[in-house]
Amino acid sequence: MTTILKHLPAGQRIGIAFSGGLDTSAALLWMRQKGAVPYAYTANLGQPDEDDYDAIPRRAMEYGAENARLIDCRKQLVAEGIAAIQCGAFHNTTGGLTYFNTTPLGRAVTGTMLVAAMKEDGVNIWGDGSTYKGNDIERFYRYGLLTNVELQIYKPWLDTDFIDELGGRHEMSEFMIACGFDYKMSVEKAYSTDSNMLGATHEAKDLEFLNSSVKIVNPIMGVKFWDESVKIPAEVVTVRFEQGHPVALNGKTFSDDVEMMLEANRIGGRHGLGMSDQIENRIIEAKSRGIYEAPGMALLHIAYERLLTGIHNEDTIEQYHSHGRQLGKLLYQGRWFDSQALMLRDGLQRWVASQITGEVTLELRRGNDYSILNTVSDNLTYKPERLTMEKGDSVFSPDDRIGQLTMRNLDITDTREKLFGYAKAGLLTASSATGLPQVENLENKGK
């Protein structure tokens, strides 16, 4: 069976991930006119730029959908977001600022939950608005086929007939108007935005040029912290975790993770926390650039990692970072449910996250500027009395340290011999300043 259909399968049911925007509206109407039977599925991901979810399925019915459903994906999305925080599943960082993989997390949820809903309706052909140059086309492909083994893929944006007739937004708008729908294009921004309640992605158009900075972006989850005219008073916030799960903000306990994430977004958003500018490698290895918002994820991540460093030992922390980066890359590639990802997730959640219990107090200022004011946990292995510089009882004596240092003589001797061996082989050069062979300075090479 052919998995990807290049032309519209007339007379068959086609499920379309329907956002209500111009692209999917025109595609749905066009498919109905060409003889297909479109079913519309809209994911409620708590998008911060969407204020009336119930209106979206109604519009789909007006444009010719056989049926239209709104699927509430918020609970599952937040669950996956918390799992990503527990695992440190983030691999794109620049200058210490992190991209929290909020779009890949959203695709993992919509790519499974929408296809599962389609399967309930006997719909085994799926279309969405992802382009052939991006990451989402592969993410949706993988998650869709994982969920429904009989699934076939039809994307109007890969159909030459659709492209020839409605190849641009102007043509789509004219098509909608000609069909009796007073659909006007929204005001064109200098970039495109995709969002869910975990974060927002701003990319393309002017942002493809690296001389266009974050300053052209209008945040939808935060504030323009770079604009000095925007008043942002400092704010003290506490975050509490129990066994790796965020449970309270500023002393208020949440039984609903969705409400907790919304409040974390509000707190972090007041400061522009979690905004970053990243150059990344797409799945196809080409580089792209995005500006990201994730105020709630950033707030929880900072508190989680503060507790992590006070609770776990050095090797565990090192593996958390190493495995987290591996897992983040798998998540980015649309492999969040693959066996290699599940293996990493299980270890990180079982042996790392389970011990993260405690409370962190921070002072948030502008953007990603913050201070940690206090860290409290019954599980802390940080114990100041062990290494206090003040006189008093100690867990080890000066003689103990002398013995430990004496044992270092063995590897110090070995290292010295290796350095002079490298010098003899011409790999290092003598240094009168240090008395040890060293790597030749780059500025001295070729002189």
Swiss-Prot record:
ATP binds at residues 17-25, 43, 129, 131, 136, 194. Pathway: Amino-acid biosynthesis; L-arginine biosynthesis; L-arginine from L-ornithine and carbamoyl phosphate: step 2/3. One of its GO terms (cellular component) is cytoplasm. Keywords: Amino-acid biosynthesis, Arginine biosynthesis, ATP-binding, Cytoplasm, Ligase, Nucleotide-binding. This is Argininosuccinate synthase. The keyword Cytoplasm applies. It comes from the Bacteria. It is found in: Cytoplasm. The gene is argG. It comes from Salmonella heidelberg (strain SL476). L-citrulline binds at residues 99, 135, 139, 192, 201, 203, 280. GO terms for biological process: argininosuccinate metabolic process; L-arginine biosynthetic process; urea cycle. InterPro entries: Arg_succ_synth_type2_subfam, Arginosuc_syn_C, Arginosuc_syn_N, Arginosuc_synth, Arginosuc_synth_CS, Arginosuc_synth_type_1_subfam, AS_cat/multimer_dom_body, AS_multimer_C_tail.
